[in-house]
Curated annotation (Swiss-Prot):
The lineage of its organism: Bacteria, Pseudomonadati, Pseudomonadota, Gammaproteobacteria, Enterobacterales. NCBIfam families: tRm6a37MtseTrmN. This is tRNA1(Val) (adenine(37)-N6)-methyltransferase. One of its GO terms (biological process) is tRNA processing. Specifically methylates the adenine in position 37 of tRNA(1)(Val) (anticodon cmo5UAC). InterPro entries: DNA_methylase_N6_adenine_CS, SAM-dependent_MTases_sf, Small_mtfrase_dom, tRNA_Adenine-N(6)_MTase, tRNA_adenine-N6_MeTrfase. Its EC number is 2.1.1.223. GO terms for molecular function: nucleic acid binding; tRNA (adenine-N6)-methyltransferase activity. It comes from Photorhabdus laumondii subsp. laumondii (strain DSM 15139 / CIP 105565 / TT01) (Photorhabdus luminescens subsp. laumondii).
C-alpha cells in the first residue's frame, strides 16, 4: 500500500517544490493555487507577480514555463519578501525568479522593463477597522494599494500584447472587471468559480488585455456535493498537488 510521506508544517508541499509561509501574513490558499495553475503562460517570457507574498504564484508559473522565462516578484512586506526569496532559492527555478522587497509604485518608476504577463492575488477588503497585525492588514486590505492603482500599475508595466490576470471574490471581481473596462482594459477570459456543486459562485479568475477581443466566460466547480474534488479541479492542479 502506498503511504503518504510526513509533510512539513511550516508551509505547503507541492509535487516539485515547497512553499514556506510561516513568516507571511497570508498563507498558501486556494485562490493563489487557482491563479498559478490557470493563468495562460504560452509564449510568455517576462512575468511580473505583484504582491507575491510567499512566492507561491511565481513558483507555480516557474514550473509551467521554459527555462528562458524570467519572473520578477514584488512584495512590500519585508518578512514575506525574505520568505519568498528563500522559497525561490530552495526551488528548482532559482535562476528564473528575482524577488524585490519594494512598493509596486516605486518599482514601476524605477524599472523600464515591460512584461507580457502580469499576475496578482490582490488585497480586496476596503479599509475599515484596523487589523492588529500590520502585515496581515497590508495583505488583505486595499489601503496600501487600491484596485484602481493596481490597474494603473499594470497598464504601465504590460506589453501591448500582454495579459493581466487576477483572482478575486466573485462580487468584488465583478466590480473589478467593470473598473478595468472603464480604464481601457478588455476582458480576455473570465472563470466563475463555486466552491461546491449547488452553492453560489464564490470566486472569479480574470484575464485582461489592452487589445480588444471577444471575451470567453467559463465556470469551474472545486468540490462535489460530498466534498470530494471535482474531476475538472483535479485536472487543473494535477501537476502541483500531491496524490493527484
Amino acid at each position: 500500500m502506498k503511504q503518504k510521506r510526513l509533510l512539513r508544517r511550516d508551509g505547503f508541499t507541492f509535487k516539485q517544490f515547497f512553499v514556506g509561509h510561516d513568516r507571511c501574513a497570508m498563507k498558501v490558499g486556494t485562490d493563489g493555487v487557482l491563479l498559478g495553475a490557470w493563468t495562460p503562460v504560452s509564449d510568455k517570457k517576462a512575468i511580473l507577480d505583484i504582491g507575491c507574498g510567499s512566492g507561491l504564484i511565481a513558483l507555480m508559473l516557474a514550473q509551467r514555463t521554459d527555462e528562458n522565462t524570467k519572473i520578477d516578484a514584488v512584495e512590500l512586506d519585508t518578512e514575506a519578501a525574505l520568505q519568498a526569496q528563500d522559497n525561490a532559492e530552495q526551488s528548482p527555478w532559482q535562476r528564473k525568479i528575482d524577488v524585490y522587497q519594494q512598493d509596486i509604485g516605486d518599482f514601476a518608476e524605477q524599472y523600464s522593463q515591460c512584461y507580457d504577463l502580469i499576475v496578482s492575488n490582490p488585497p480586496y477588503f476596503e479599509p475599515a477597522v484596523a487589523c492588529r497585525n500590520e502585515a496581515r492588514e497590508q495583505a488583505r486590505y486595499t489601503g496600501s494599494m487600491t484596485h484602481q492603482q493596481l490597474l494603473q500599475y499594470a497598464e504601465t508595466l504590460i506589453t501591448a500584447d500582454g495579459l493581466f490576470c487576477v483572482v478575486l471574490p466573485y462580487a468584488i471581481g465583478e466590480e473589478f472587471e467593470t473598473m478595468a473596462c472603464h480604464q481601457g482594459w478588455f476582458s480576455h477570459h473570465r472563470v466563475n468559480i463555486r466552491d461546491r456543486q449547488g452553492k453560489p459562485l464564490h470566486r472569479m479568475l480574470l484575464a485582461f488585455s489592452r487589445k480588444e477581443k471577444t471575451g470567453l466566460i467559463s465556470e469551474l466547480t472545486i468540490r462535489q456535493p460530498d466534498g470530494a474534488y471535482t474531476q475538472e479541479f483535479q485536472q487543473l492542479v494535477t501537476d502541483f498537488y500531491l496524490y493527484y
